[in-house]
Structure formats: C-alpha cells, structure tokens
C-alpha cells in the first residue's frame, strides 16, 4: 500500500492531495490517537481533577471553623481536625468541606476543580470554533494538529513545577491542556474522511462500479439534473453519482474499521499507562514524599507520553490541504490582523456550517441525537464515580481500578462490535442503538435499589461496592463501540471538503451538552440528598436518542451531502462559497434536502 495505486481520482479543488492513503499515513493517524487518548483517559478522566483538588486542599482550611488547615501538620491540628470532622458529620451530611480563597472568593476544593473543568470546556468550545474551519483550508490541518499536540503536552509536563502555593497556576494549565486536547482531536477526526476517500480499497471499488450497477441520484427539485460524484464535484458536466449499496458499504466499513482500530489502540495504551501511573503513586507514597508530588509526577509522565508520540504522527501524516483561504484575508497584513481575520473567518464559517447542517435532514437528526447521547455518556460517567466515592465509600485505588476495568472493556468493545456488526449484518446506526440499550442497564440497575425487597436482600441495585465493577465493564464495552461508530457514521453524512468544520460542529455539540446533564444531576442531589434518584433521570436521558439514531439513513444522508457540496459553488481559488446556497435558485434545492425521501 505504500506505493499506492496507479489511478488517481480527479482533485476537487486546486492543490488537493489525491495520492492514495498509505500504511505510513494510517500509522500516523493511529499514533496521535495513541498519544492523546492516554492523556484523555489517564489525566483528564482520572488524575487531573484529583491533582487540582489536592493542590487546593493543601492551601485550604476546614469549612467548620475556617482556621484548621485541611492538611494538618502536627498532632494538635490532627486532633482538632478529627473532632471538627466528627462534629460536622453529626450535624448533617456534606457540611465537612475544605475551602480555599481564590482571588478573594471562598470555594470548596472540590468545586474549584469543577469550575476549572467548566472553564476548560467553555474555552475549548471557543477554540474549536476559532480554528476548525481554518483547518479546512490551505495547509493548516497538519500545522494545527502539531501545534495543539506540542502545546498541550508541554503544559501537562509543567504540572511538575506547580506547588500548592501556586495552585491557581494548575487551573490555568488545565484549561490549556483540555483546550489543546479537544482541538487536536477535532483536527484528527477531520483526517478520517480523507483517509477513507483516498484509500486504495475505496478507489478500487469505485473503479469497478463505473458503468455497472451505478444508482443515479434523483434531482432535488423538478427540472434539475443530477449532481456530480463525490470525488469530482467541481469538474465537468453533471454526472450520475455512484451511491450503490456496495460502494456505500465499502466506505462505511473502512471508515468504521479505521476508527475502531484507532480507539482500540488508544484504549490499550491508556490501560498500560494507567497501570504504570498507579505504580508510580504507590512507590512514591511509600517513600513519604509530598502528597501532591506523586500526582504531579504522574501528570508529567502522561504529558511526556503525549509529546513523544505526537512527533511521529506529525512526521507520518500528510498535509492533505484543503481549498486555499480567501486571498483578501491574509495578503499584506500584520500577524495580529491576520489572526483576527482568520478568527472572524472561522466564526463566520461556523455560522454558515450551522445553516448548511440545518438543511441536511440526516445530519440534523444525528446532531440532535448526538447532543443527547454525549450528554448521557458524560453524565453517567461522572455520576457513577461520585456514587462510588460517596455512597459506596470506595477509595482512590478502588476507583482507579474501576477506571482500568472500564478502559480495558473499551478495548474489547472496539474490537467486538465490528465483529458483531459483520456477523449479524447490522447497520452502523443499529450498532449505536444496541450500545445505548446496553448502557441503559446501568441506571436501571441502580434504580433497583429503591425496591423494598431488593433493599431487604442487602445486595443488588448497587448496594455493595463490588456491584459497580460489572457495570464498569458494560460502560467500557459501550464506550468502545460509541467512540468509533459515532464519528465514522457522522463522517459519511457531511459534505465533502468541509470535514474540519463539520467535525467542529460535532465536537461543539458534544461539549455544549456536557454541562446540562451534570447540572440537572446536581439539582437532584441537592433536592434529595442522595445520588441514587439521579439514575431515573439518566435512564430517560439515555433512552431519548435511541429513536433518533434509528431514524438516520446513511445512504440518503450521503446523497444529501453530495448534493449540498454541489450547491456550494467553488470560486476561482478553490474556496467553497456557502453563501451561494442562499443567493441562488439552488436555495430551493437546499430546502428540499430537509424533506423526507420517498
């Protein structure tokens, strides 16, 4: 595969790289997933929030008297802290808190970590908007991936220098790390459709299908001719588009295969690194070093991993440039003004992308489902960890083991779901629905704890700590499927040539929903004083996207995406003009994309 094939498809715009996808390029794609997924699982999902809370705790005082340090240094302070803790426990739940002063405002150490991640998600959403559309143009895709990878990994390594006295710096580094992580994943995802489109397997299938069982697209409105095929959208006369089931199946299967393999590699590396991190914590704690130094060392190690594997991924991936940016944006301008122009261009592009997405019925249905689905996944993860730490009284090591169990199951899930799909001839959206139905077992099992005779047993319904581990296996299996199938499924529904912009919309939808579910769960916990009632909300939240995912038709979505790409006229420099959709008679055709297919 290194040498590619002899026949190259025609470029869709000037300077497009239509060279066949090589094994080297695929290794680069997998390598960055290997680098960044480790940080996402080990740092963001495990040790980073604990580190932030512990750094703040060492500078905090008990809420009960606002005098006693949270980390007592001598016997008297330890005795006072113990008495205060016992008294506060007797007064009622959740009154024994550790508070810290942040710029004149008193915050609990736990909420300090929560607010940090909330700010990170908000800043990440802004950054995604500002850079993703730019990644679709010129040679910025690979440059941005490298920039975010190096910046994020170095920021993680700098945690080694953050001592409790400057714990606020840890909050700043967290924001930088999370922003870089999210943006780099969006850019990496934008490579997936291009790798599939230029893969020799897909090109070979298209060559064999020409002149045989090609299925022409029906006109969007009467009197309109069919649009051009996906790989020749802006050249020559209108032609029939080959969207036969065989070609579509080839695209989708290859996309899912690449995505699943990437997720599996990332999860496998995450499990291995997490085991090493636990060993680092164990041995450093045995040495009696500072309580935050082991955690900071772990973050340094994870950041080093991210940096190390980013280097070969940048070397192996091609630029795969998109259409050039409009000349007026950058010629003869200073650096700052150029950056402002790029940012304004990106926000305008997002708004145009949203308007295009609204006109694509299948994309719109999927994004609504994805909003609910991603919110459910994020909320159930946070709720389960909180439930384990509070109501099941599980320690840090036990929770870390739970994380390893779930991640290991994710590896199995990423491998098994494609086998199940092939064995039973299931469509991609059917696999996603199966994953959601399996995930539904988690909150339903938690709700069993409300049934009187189950309570009388003393086991079942998440009354014992060991019951959460089988649920962790289920959660991991589901995540292994959803992580690969959702992004590959979405990639086939978007207009070609706008990959980064639409994957940014995909990520923004994900991040935008992540604050909704946890906030509602927080309100439920505040009102009831328990976490278990939140399982009822989670059961409903998981069920809502199931019918929407079932409704999505990938074949019709591909047809709509190709038509929409054809409606987006190309300027002389290869830049796609979104405004042409509304500024011409083709706007009526775009509206037709929202109609049901007969």
From Swiss-Prot:
Main localization category: membrane
Comp. bias regions, Basic and acidic residues: 228-237, 585-598
Pfam families linked to this entry: ATG22
Entry GO terms, CC: vacuolar membrane
Keyword terms of this UniProt record: Amino-acid transport, Autophagy, Glycoprotein, Membrane, Transmembrane, Transmembrane helix, Transport, Vacuole
Bilayer topology term: Multi-pass membrane protein
InterPro entries: Atg22, Atg22-like, ATG22/LtaA_families, MFS_trans_sf
Function: Vacuolar effluxer which mediate the efflux of amino acids resulting from autophagic degradation. The release of autophagic amino acids allows the maintenance of protein synthesis and viability during nitrogen starvation.
Name of this chain's protein: Autophagy-related protein 22
Species for this entry: Botryotinia fuckeliana (strain B05.10) (Noble rot fungus)
Gene (UniProt): atg22
């Amino acid at each position: 595969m290194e040498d590619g094939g002899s026949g190259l498809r025609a470029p869709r715009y000037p300077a497009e790289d239509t060279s066949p996808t090589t094994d080297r390029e695929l290794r680069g794609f997998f390598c960055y997933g290997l680098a960044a997924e480790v940080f996402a699982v080990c740092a963001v999902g495990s040790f980073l929030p604990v580190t932030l809370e512990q750094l703040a705790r060492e500078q905090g005082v008990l809420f009960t008297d606002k005098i006693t340090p949270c980390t007592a240094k001598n016997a008297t302070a330890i005795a006072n802290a113990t008495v205060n803790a016992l008294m506060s426990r007797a007064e009622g739940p959740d009154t024994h808190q550790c508070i810290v002063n942040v710029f004149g405002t008193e915050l609990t150490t736990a909420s300090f970590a929560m607010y940090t991640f909330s700010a990170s998600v908000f800043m990440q959403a802004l950054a995604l908007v500002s850079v993703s559309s730019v990644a679709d143009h010129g040679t910025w895709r690979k440059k941005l991936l490298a920039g975010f990878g190096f910046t994020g990994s170095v920021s993680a390594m700098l945690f080694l220098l953050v001592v409790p006295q400057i714990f606020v710096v840890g909050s700043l580094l967290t924001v930088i790390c999370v922003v870089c992580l999210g943006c780099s994943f969006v850019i990496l995802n934008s490579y997936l459709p291009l790798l599939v489109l230029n893969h020799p397997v897909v090109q070979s299938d298209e060559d064999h299908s020409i002149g045989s069982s090609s299925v022409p697209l029906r006109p969007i409105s009467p009197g309109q001719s069919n649009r051009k095929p996906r790989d020749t959208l802006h050249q020559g006369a209108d032609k029939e588009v080959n969207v036969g089931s065989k070609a579509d199946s080839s695209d989708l299967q290859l996309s899912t295969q690449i995505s699943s393999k990437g997720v599996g590699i990332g999860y496998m590396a995450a499990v291995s690194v997490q085991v090493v991190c636990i060993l680092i914590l164990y041995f450093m704690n045995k040495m009696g070093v500072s309580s935050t130094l082991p955690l900071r060392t772990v973050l340094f190690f994870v950041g080093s991993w991210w940096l190390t594997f980013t280097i070969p991924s940048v070397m192996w991936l091609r630029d795969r440039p998109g259409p050039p940016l409009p000349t007026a944006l950058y010629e003869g301008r200073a650096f700052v003004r150029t950056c402002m122009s790029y940012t304004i261009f990106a926000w305008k592009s997002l708004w145009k992308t949203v308007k295009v997405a609204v006109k694509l019925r299948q994309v719109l249905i999927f994004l609504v489902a994805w909003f609910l689905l991603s919110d459910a996944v994020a909320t159930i993860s946070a709720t389960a960890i909180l439930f384990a730490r509070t109501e099941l009284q599980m320690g840090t090591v036990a929770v870390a083991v739970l994380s390893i169990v779930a991640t290991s199951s994710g590896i199995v899930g990423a491998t098994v779901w494609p086998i199940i799909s092939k064995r039973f001839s299931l469509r991609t959206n059917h696999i996603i629905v199966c994953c959601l139905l399996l995930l539904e077992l988690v909150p339903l099992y938690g709700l069993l704890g409300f049934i009187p005779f189950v309570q009388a047993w003393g086991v079942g319904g998440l009354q014992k700590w060991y019951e959460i581990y089988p649920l962790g296996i289920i959660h991991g299996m589901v995540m292994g499927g959803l992580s690969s199938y959702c992004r590959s499924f979405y990639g086939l529904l978007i207009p070609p040539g706008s990959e980064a912009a639409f994957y940014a919309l995909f990520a923004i939808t994900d991040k935008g929903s992540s604050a909704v579910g946890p906030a509602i769960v927080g309100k439920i916990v505040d009102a009831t004083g328990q976490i278990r009632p939140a399982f009822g909300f989670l059961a409903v939240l998981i069920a809502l996207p199931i019918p929407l995912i079932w409704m999505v038709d990938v074949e019709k979505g591909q047809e709509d995406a190709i038509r929409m790409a054809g409606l987006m006229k190309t300027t002389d420099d290869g830049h796609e003009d979104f405004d042409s959709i509304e500024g011409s008679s083709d706007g009526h055709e775009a509206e037709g994309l929202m109609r049901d297919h007969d």
